[in-house]
């Protein structure tokens, strides 16, 4: 059955090869002949635990990929982060060619699965599905990128291409401050013309031209305190917990229907005495049912598609916070996380080019996917500087949880898509 499915995958591209250039056909033929080697590279990387905080594991995956890229003529560097960030660093592979646009290819070495978390080795579940830690997010995508580059080398095209392949070591849990963790990443991206990221694909027919940004907010409420028998009176007021509840519910009423905007209070503490450990996201509260609460503390996130949407939402939230209940006072402060990857004209033009590519390959149309289906990613840090696309990696289900899977039927086609697309962009 597996052989039959691979044959069908070959036919999907073979039937329209007349519309492809000779180097594109050579790259596709290489992938058909070497899909087993690509799968073995995937298995080897999945079977190395590389949770973000497992520094040795992240570096081991980096060494595995570096060996493959070095064979292709890439210059290999390891970019160390400051010791204070407690992260492994990043793998950077550079190939200098003679012509064409300079491509910035993005992967990441780490996964969410730390050594003490439930996750498993690469395991084939059936003829179309395999599972394993990070198998699609994003070791599957890393191998898509590397195998596509191998195919272009075999087709005699890589020698002319200008490529930086950048694999971050802390995408899932960036070192802090984030500006330090991504300084080198941003600087190198700004020397390039186009960025392509190999995060999980959502099937064969969509790609990410936009990703929502992420930011945080902190709400602090203080209030008069006293015996609960006097709550709601002019002298005592409503208390901090009621004020926090009013604010959160008004956020929900006024902002929850706006497309691509989400906000989530993930942590709340209130009572007579409140202690917060922001570093470990923990809190303690003490209170009694007959005491009006004088303090409440809430933290949450805010996700948005554009900077304008973010700022408009923040202004509404400030206005809501300012309308305090009697006897209370509230303040809200905001923190920036990852910016949005906005659906710019340059990104949409890349979608059109990819759509032409997949049509020529016989895969069918490719459209821009729903930005609301994705959170922020490494590409968000550089999206303001150059045209970019994401979601060019492996497809599957269940990312970030035990049982994460990869779709083995779509995998060869996604590698071919990447190879032909990179070839066309580099012309």
Spans of model-derived segments:
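Bacterial Sec-dependent N-terminal signal peptides
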Residues: 1-23
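Metal-dependent amide/peptide-bond hydrolase catalytic core
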Residues: 19-26, 51, 68, 84, ...
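Acidic/His- and Gly-rich active-site-bordering loop/insert found
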Residues: 19-133, 153-158
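Short glycine/proline-enriched loop/turn "hinge" motifs that connect secondary-structure elements
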Residues: 34, 113-115, 157, 209-213, ...
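Extracytoplasmic/secreted envelope proteins and their assembly/folding machinery
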Residues: 39-43, 62, 66, 142, ...
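Alpha-helical metal-binding/catalytic segments enriched in His/Glu/Asp
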Residues: 105, 126-176, 217-221, 232-254, ...
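Short, flexible, mixed-charge acidic loops at enzyme active sites
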Residues: 114-124, 210-215, 278-283
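Acidic/histidine-rich catalytic neighborhood of metal-dependent amide-processing enzymes
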Residues: 138-214, 270-280, 426-427
């Amino acid at each position: 059955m597996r052989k039959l499915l691979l044959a069908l995958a070959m036919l999907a591209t073979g039937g329209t090869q007349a519309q492809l250039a000779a180097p594109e056909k050579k790259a596709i033929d290489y992938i058909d002949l070497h899909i087993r080697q690509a799968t073995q590279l995937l298995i080897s990387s999945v079977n190395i635990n590389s949770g973000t905080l497992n520094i040795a594991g992240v570096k081991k995956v980096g060494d595995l990929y570096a060996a493959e890229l070095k064979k292709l003529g890439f210059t290999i560097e390891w970019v160390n982060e400051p010791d204070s960030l407690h992260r492994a660093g990043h793998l950077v592979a550079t190939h200098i060619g003679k012509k064409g646009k300079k491509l910035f290819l993005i992967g990441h070495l780490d996964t969410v699965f730390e050594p003490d978390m439930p996750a498993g080795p690469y395991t084939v579940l059936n003829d179309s599905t395999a599972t394993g830690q990070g198998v699609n997010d994003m070791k599957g995508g890393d191998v898509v990128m590397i195998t596509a580059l191998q195919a272009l080398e075999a087709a005699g095209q890589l020698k002319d291409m200008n490529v930086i392949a950048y694999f971050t070591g802390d995408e899932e849990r960036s070192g802090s401050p984030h500006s330090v963790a991504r300084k080198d990443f941003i600087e190198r991206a700004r020397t390039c013309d186009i960025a392509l990221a190999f995060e999980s694909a959502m099937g064969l027919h969509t790609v990410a031209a936009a990703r929502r940004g992420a930011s945080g907010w902190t709400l602090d409420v203080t209030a008069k305190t006293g015996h609960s028998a006097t709550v709601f009176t002019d002298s005592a007021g409503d208390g901090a917990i009621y004020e926090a509840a009013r604010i959160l519910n008004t956020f929900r009423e006024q902002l929850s229907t706006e497309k691509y905007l989400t906000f989530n209070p993930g942590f709340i503490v209130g009572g007579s005495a409140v202690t917060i450990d922001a570093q470990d996201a923990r809190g303690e509260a003490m209170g009694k049912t007959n005491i009006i609460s004088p303090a409440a503390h809430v933290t949450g996130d805010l996700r948005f598609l554009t900077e304008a949407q973010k700022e408009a939402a923040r202004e509404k939230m400030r206005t809501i916070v300012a309308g305090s209940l009697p006897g209370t006072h509230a303040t809200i402060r905001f923190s920036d996380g990852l910016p949005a990857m906005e659906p710019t004209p340059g990104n949409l033009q890349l979608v059109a080019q990819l759509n032409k590519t997949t049509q020529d390959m016989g895969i069918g149309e490719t459209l821009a996917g729903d930005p609301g289906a994705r959170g922020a990613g490494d590409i968000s840090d550089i999206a303001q500087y150059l045209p970019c696309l994401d979601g060019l990696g492996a497809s599957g289900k269940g990312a970030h949880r035990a049982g994460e899977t990869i779709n083995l039927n779509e995998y060869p086609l996604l590698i071919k898509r990447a190879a032909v697309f990179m070839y066309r962009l580099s012309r």
